[in-house]
A protein has these predicted regions:
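Metal-ion/cofactor- or nucleotide/acyl-coenzyme-handling active-site neighborhoods
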Residues: 1-204
Length: 204
């Protein structure tokens, strides 16, 4: 696909041509088989811990949106997958250096050609977003979508870091829970229920 064709498809909300740039869900999840995965959220509370070495020891490290890493001691340094629901500058992408980008947002208009054309690119299906939105009763966070997606793979272990469901706010902004369109209580229940059913998943 050419850049022009991509821009036209995106502007006209033609899902199929844009989705054709994505690796399949089957291929994406197969890459997780038997792997130890670290999903790093953006809670401020993570910066008070010394988990960076543990995070960097994972087979695959997934970070979210702007992927703040204020200290290697607390956050580690590596990013294998970057789950995005917002646009990022070239400087941010150069700082994060992800090996693969997953576009999780249902808003395709924010998806850039450079990201869509990147190696290993994955486009999260709209029906998956809508299913989780219905389950939670509100738009899901990028973190919740990633937990849902990763749990459906054959990974060996999934450890969640930097997830306190907005109790300490986010490292990437100053908004409170009342100022964002997510239901963090519902997401907390969702994760707790998932961990109770799936012993591979833990919250640190």
């Amino acid at each position: 696909m050419t850049r022009l064709r991509f821009l036209i498809s995106r502007a006209m909300r033609q899902e199929a041509p844009v989705a054709a740039l994505s690796v399949s869900r089957l291929k994406l999840l197969a890459d997780l088989n038997e792997r130890n995965v670290a999903l790093v959220g953006n809670a401020r509370s993570l910066s008070e811990k010394a988990l960076g070495t543990e995070i960097d020891a994972a087979d695959i490290i997934v970070r979210i949106n702007r992927a703040p890493m204020p200290s290697a001691v607390s956050h580690g340094t590596r990013t294998d997958w970057l789950a995005l629901a917002t646009s990022l500058s070239d400087d941010d992408l150069e700082r994060i250096k992800p090996h693969r980008i997953l576009w999780m947002s249902h808003k395709r208009k924010r998806l850039s050609w450079n990201i869509a054309n990147s190696e290993g690119f994955y486009l999260h299906p709209l029906e998956d977003y809508e299913r989780l939105k219905q389950q939670l009763g509100s738009p899901p966070t990028t973190g919740a979508m990633m937990i849902d997606l990763l749990s459906q793979s054959g990974l060996g272990r999934l450890t969640l870091y930097g997830f306190d469901f907005f109790a300490s706010l986010s490292l990437t902004g100053s908004r409170t829970a009342d100022q964002v369109p997510h239901d963090f209580s519902a997401e907390k229940r969702f994760v707790e229920d998932l961990m109770a059913r799936d012993q591979r998943i833990s919250l640190t």
